[in-house]
C-alpha cells in the first residue's frame, strides 16, 4: 500500500513538472531545418510564445536551422539538442543592428536580447556563426577583412544588453565573424561547460566578453579564439551600466592568436574584484593581459594556479609571447592609426587609470618571452605581486624576439628591449617573492636578466631562484 502511494505521488510530481515546463518545438512554428531556408521568423515565433508562459524552446536534432537575426526573451530556455545546429545566414543584408549602438563600425547583432531575465541556453547542440562566410581572402596568418562603408555587417553571435539571471551551459558555440558571447550590463550570470571554437585566423573573434557586467561565474570551458578568449571591459557606448566586478573564472583551457585572458583595453569605469583560478593557456601569443588604455581603473584581481604557454607570431596579432602582461598607457589620440572615432574627444581623451592590487601566485610560464609590466607614469602601476611564479624562456620559433608590444597606445607600438624573466618599466611598487627563472638551450643575445627593472620606485625581490641568461656577462637582477 505504501509503495503504491509513493509511486502515485512520484507520477503526480512528474506530471506537474512536465506540465510546468512547456516545450515549444520550433518545427511546429514552421521551421524547416533544411540548412537553406531562413528559419529566423519561426524561431522568433516560438521564443515569443514561450516567453509569455515560460518554458523551453526546442531546437530539435538532427536538423540544421539556417537563420538571420532573432531576439531572445525572458523566461526562456533555448535548448539545442545534440546533433542540432543553428547556423547564421551568410546574407550580409540581413544584419542591420549595430552591436555598439551609434557606433556602426564594429559589427552587428545576430542573436540578441535586451533587458532579458531568467534566460538560458542548454543542450549539447551547436550555435554556428558561419564566420568564414563574412571573411575576405585567407592569408597565411589571418583572413583579410572585407571593406565596408558605414555598417560593418560581421555579426556577433550572441549579445545580451541589460540581462539578469543568465545561464549558458554545455552548448557548442563559435565559428564567429566577430565577438561570440557579449554580455553587456548583465547581473548574475553562469557560463559552464561550453565548448567555444573560433578560427585562429579570424580577427576580432573574441570568445566571451563581459562588458560592465557583475556577479559572473565562468567554469569548465574550452575556448579557442583568434582574438581574446575571455575579456573583461567597460565600453563607452554602455556607460550607464557601471563597473565590471565580482567575476570568477575557474577550470578553463584556452588558446588564442592574441591574448587568452584580457582585462581592457576599453575601460572607462572600474574593473575590480576578479579571480582567475585553475586555468591552462596553450600556444597563445599572449597569456594574461591587463591592458588599460582609458580612464577607468583595474584593481583587486587574483590569478592563481595556472599554466601559461606563449609563442611568437606575426604582427597582425597584439602581443609578443608575454605570458603575463600588465600595462597602463593612454590610448592613441587624434588621427593616429590606433585611434578610432569611437573613443572620446575632450576631457577624457589621453587619460589612463591606475592598475593596483594585482596578485599572481603559483603560475608556471613557458615560452619565448618573459613577464612584462609597464606604466605611462609610476602612479599607474601599484602593488603588483608575483609569488611562486616560475618563468622558463626558450627561443622556439623563427619570428623575431627582443620586442615588446604596447598597442594600442599613443606610444610607439613596438619597443625593442632585452628579454628578461621579469621586465619592469615605470611603476610605483612591485614585489617578486619565491619566483624562479630558467633559460632553454636556444639563447639569442637579447636574452639577458632574470629580473630587469627601470624607473620603479619600490621593487622587492625575495628568494629568487635563477640567474641571467649569460651569467658570465650579466647579473641576475638589473636595477
Task: Please annotate each region the language model reported.
Residues 1-23:
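Bacterial Sec-dependent N-terminal signal peptides
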Residues 17-479:
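Extracellular/periplasmic carbohydrate-active domains that bind, remodel
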Amino acid at each position: 500500500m505504501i509503495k503504491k502511494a509513493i509511486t502515485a505521488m512520484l507520477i503526480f510530481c512528474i506530471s506537474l513538472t512536465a506540465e510546468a515546463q512547456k516545450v515549444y518545438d520550433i518545427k511546429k512554428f514552421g521551421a524547416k531545418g533544411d540548412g537553406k531556408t531562413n528559419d529566423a521568423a519561426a524561431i522568433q515565433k516560438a521564443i515569443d510564445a514561450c516567453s509569455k508562459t515560460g518554458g523551453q524552446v526546442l531546437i530539435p536534432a538532427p536538423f540544421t536551422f539556417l537563420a538571420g537575426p532573432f531576439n531572445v526573451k525572458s523566461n526562456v530556455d533555448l535548448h539545442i539538442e545534440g546533433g542540432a545546429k543553428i547556423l547564421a545566414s551568410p546574407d550580409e543584408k540581413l544584419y542591420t543592428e549595430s552591436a555598439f549602438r551609434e557606433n556602426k563600425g564594429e559589427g552587428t547583432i545576430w542573436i540578441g536580447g535586451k533587458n532579458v531575465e531568467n534566460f538560458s541556453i542548454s543542450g549539447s547542440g551547436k550555435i554556428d556563426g558561419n564566420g568564414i562566410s563574412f571573411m575576405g581572402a585567407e592569408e597565411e596568418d589571418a583572413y583579410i577583412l572585407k571593406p565596408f562603408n558605414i555598417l560593418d555587417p560581421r555579426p556577433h553571435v550572441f549579445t545580451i544588453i541589460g540581462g539578469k539571471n543568465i545561464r549558458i551551459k554545455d552548448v557548442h558555440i563559435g565559428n564567429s565573424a566577430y565577438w561570440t558571447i557579449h554580455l553587456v550590463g548583465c547581473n548574475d550570470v553562469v557560463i559552464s561547460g561550453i565548448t567555444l571554437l573560433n578560427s585562429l585566423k579570424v580577427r576580432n573573434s573574441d570568445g566571451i566578453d563581459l562588458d560592465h557586467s557583475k556577479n559572473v561565474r565562468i567554469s569548465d570551458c574550452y575556448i579557442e579564439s583568434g582574438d581574446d578568449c575571455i575579456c573583461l571591459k567597460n565600453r563607452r557606448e554602455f556607460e550607464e551600466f557601471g563597473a565590471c566586478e565580482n567575476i570568477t573564472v575557474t577550470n578553463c583551457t584556452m588558446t588564442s592568436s592574441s591574448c587568452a585572458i584580457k582585462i581592457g583595453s576599453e575601460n572607462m569605469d572600474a574593473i575590480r574584484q576578479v579571480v582567475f583560478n585553475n586555468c591552462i593557456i596553450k600556444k597563445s601569443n599572449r597569456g594574461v593581459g591587463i591592458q588599460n588604455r582609458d580612464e577607468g581603473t583595474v584593481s583587486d584581481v587574483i590569478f592563481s594556479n595556472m599554466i601559461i604557454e606563449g609563442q611568437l607570431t606575426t604582427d597582425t596579432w597584439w602581443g609578443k609571447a608575454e605570458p603575463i602582461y600588465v600595462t597602463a598607457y593612454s590610448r592613441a589620440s587624434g588621427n593616429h592609426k590606433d585611434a578610432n572615432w569611437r573613443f572620446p574627444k575632450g576631457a577624457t581623451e589621453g587619460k589612463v587609470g591606475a592598475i593596483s592590487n594585482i596578485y599572481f601566485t603559483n603560475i608556471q610560464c613557458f615560452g619565448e618571452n618573459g613577464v612584462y609590466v609597464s606604466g605611462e607614469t609610476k602612479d599607474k602601476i601599484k602593488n603588483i605581486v608575483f609569488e611562486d611564479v616560475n618563468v622558463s624562456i626558450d627561443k622556439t620559433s623563427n619570428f623575431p624576439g627582443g620586442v615588446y608590444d604596447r598597442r594600442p597606445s599613443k606610444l610607439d607600438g613596438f619597443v625593442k628591449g632585452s628579454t628578461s624573466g621579469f621586465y619592469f618599466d615605470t611603476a610605483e611598487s612591485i614585489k617578486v617573492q619565491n619566483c624562479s627563472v630558467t633559460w632553454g638551450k636556444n639563447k639569442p643575445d637579447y636574452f639577458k636578466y632574470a629580473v630587469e627593472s627601470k624607473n620603479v620606485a619600490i621593487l622587492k625581490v625575495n628568494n629568487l631562484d635563477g640567474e641571467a641568461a649569460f651569467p658570465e656577462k650579466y647579473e641576475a637582477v638589473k636595477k
